[in-house]
Curated annotation (Swiss-Prot):
InterPro entries: Amanitin/phalloidin. GO terms for molecular function: toxin activity. This is Beta-amanitin proprotein. There is a cross-link at I11-P18 (Cyclopeptide (Ile-Pro)). Keywords: Thioether bond, Toxin. Toxin belonging to the bicyclic octapeptides amatoxins that acts by binding non-competitively to RNA polymerase II and greatly slowing the elongation of transcripts from target promoters.
């Protein structure tokens, strides 16, 4: 959980790309 929270902010900042955004959403959904 800590790793997800730690990488969450930078990923969201970079996640402007739709592809990355989709991956992040899946990862966050799985993590939470």
């Amino acid at each position: 959980m800590s790793d997800i929270n730690a990488t969450r902010l930078p990923i969201w900042g970079i996640g402007c790309d739709p592809c990355i955004g989709d991956d992040v959403t899946i990862l966050l959904t799985r993590g939470e």
